Amino acid sequence: MKSFNHLIIHFRTYGLKHKFLYSASIMLFFWTIFDGIISYISPLVIISSGYSNTMMGIIIGTSSIAGALFDFLLSKYLQNSHWRRLYLIMFIVCLIQPLILWQSKVAVIYLLAMAMWGLYYDLLGFGNFDFVSREMETDEHASSFGVLGVFKSLGYLLAPLIVGLVIGEMLDWKPFVLALVFLSMSFIFFLILYINGKKRGIRIERLQQYRPKGFLVEINLWKKIGKVMLPFLIFTMLMSMQDSFFWTIGPILSETFVKFKPLDGLFLTAYSLPPLLVGWFIDKFKGTFGRKANYISFIISSLFLITFAIFRHPLILLFVILLSSTFSTFSWAIEQGLYADYIEDSFSKEKEIEGLVDFSVNAGYVVGPILAGFLSDKVGYFNTFAFLGIFSFFVTLILSRIAPKRVAIGG
């Protein structure tokens, strides 16, 4: 998770040497606005078809199940595919998915739309990885991924605000057309990348460094590493659940802020702002709270969420969301740093650690929407966030007590 300060440092270090990377970043920026619009309107579209919040949560949760399945299949069959092919397939799927979502009326078609959502997101991830590994020098990989991450965060920041301007009293064709406009803008930059990439020729020949160890061996490694890292993996799942709550029922709650129209998208914009800013303060925060900083910050974030049971005024809630998101972002950033340290200490287990982390994230994005939908049917949208805060508070408190001071995975 990189903030604006990373982009400034990267540009000072490399300047215009990375024009190709900046073109890819702009492509990703417009694509992320497209995806942010789809993320925002998906729960609204499903609810408008007469489905309950619980059913809506189940439908959205299937996108992460499909994503996990496609992640396995793509890693198995598209290991050496070029980023040009991966991005091109992604754009084709992205073009079809909103059209299916727009015309969906029955659950089966919604499930198909969610599966395509999971597919194109995985294609983007594989495309980004291949792009950086082929086009950037090895010692520039981490910084290059950081630049892509900044533009991605910026897109998700603006998407709710932009789509909120075109959603009226009824959800019609306008948000879908708007999403496709930004997808088209992204595709233009892809064409520029495609043409310039052909001219550049082969920059870096990718080597297959990872050899699968066999299914049973992998399962045993997952069990061994997962047992040691269990508190951290549960914590990652919890953070993913919180994020999915905001993107599942946040758009619906935003539409209840009548006084804010047409700026009701500010709800998720306030939630998406901190990831772009906390980079300047993360080291100081860690220095203040020490090795438990990730848990302490999430406990504070959860306490702010509990106040949803009390406050109803949109301006107060925006401030609460901003503060809660700020502290949860600290937790995300610190947790990612911990995983990076574990990988550095046990480099031969890199793929297994990454696989377990991805599994925890996917699990959070499956359980989160289902739980968010169910609770909002039972206790309402505001109390759902309050319940999330209470649940997160106690789980994080327990994890902070049982988490080991040091994780020894072995070489």
Predicted regions: what they are:
Residues 58-74, 269-281:
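Central cavity-lining transmembrane alpha-helices of secondary-active solute carriers
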Residues 85-99, 180, 292-307:
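Structural signature of the two symmetry-related core transmembrane helices
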Residues 2-18, 197-232:
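Juxtamembrane intracellular "pre-TM" segments in multi-pass secondary transporters
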Residues 7-64, 227-267:
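Helix-loop boundary and gating motifs at the non-cytosolic
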Residues 117-151:
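Cytoplasmic helix-loop-helix junction between adjacent transmembrane helices
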Residues 123-136, 330-345:
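Intracellular juxtamembrane helix-capping segments at the cytosolic ends
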